[in-house]
Amino acid sequence: QGKAVAELMYACGVAVDMEYSPDGSGAYSGIVADALIQYFGYNKNMGYVSRNYFNTQEWMDMVKKELNEKRPILYNGASKEVGHEFVLDGYDKNNLVHVNWGWGGMNNGYFEIASLEPTSPGIGGGSSMGGGYIFDQGMIIGMQPESESTSYTSYFSLSELKASKSSFNQNESYDLTAVQLSNMTSTF
């Protein structure tokens, strides 16, 4: 079994062009999703969502939806010192998420999504967390094997609408134009 795990870890590292150093390793989230699709048969409807565009309730609703669908979440965040990628694989009745930090079981457990602060970070975790992995949070959603019955949900932000008229009468038609519409998700 150890040999099979080693071979899988090697294949994963090669697939994402992993950079290694004595202090840790790393790859970009977009590369990870591409590799899962291209080399490991995962569904092409995966998407990356940035937490910047959602309030806490909306974000937790998305997390719970993914986990309720039996899909683990590849999650990223940064402290003042370093960034880290880890897995969310559950939640409890108090809205704490279960985190597998990827450090051989060290510090795995339930955390508030707003703080995500392990007590003693593992390799690559930095010497002082500086408040946890609370910056630049995002997640890859829709992570599942390829199947024909999947769909992808895009999330959009609308920050400005313009009307064709400045005043309106009841039952009168007018045009609304979306001036600034942003796609807050990306597919791979």
Specify the residue positions occupied by each region the protein language model found.
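Short linear sequence elements within intrinsically disordered, low-complexity coil regions
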Residues: 15, 45, 115-116, 173, ...
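Short, compositionally biased P/S/T/A/G/V-rich stretches that sit at domain boundaries
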Residues: 130, 136-186
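Surface-exposed charge patches in extracellular/virion surface proteins
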Residues: 3, 65, 162-165
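Catalytic Cys-His active-site segments of thiol-dependent hydrolases/isopeptidases
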Residues: 94-113
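Cysteine-nucleophile protease catalytic domains, especially the papain-like/related folds used
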Residues: 1-49
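Active-site-adjacent substructure of cysteine-protease-like catalytic cores
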Residues: 34, 38-100
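A recognition module on extended beta-rich or small alphabeta surfaces enriched in W/G with H and D/E
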Residues: 107-146
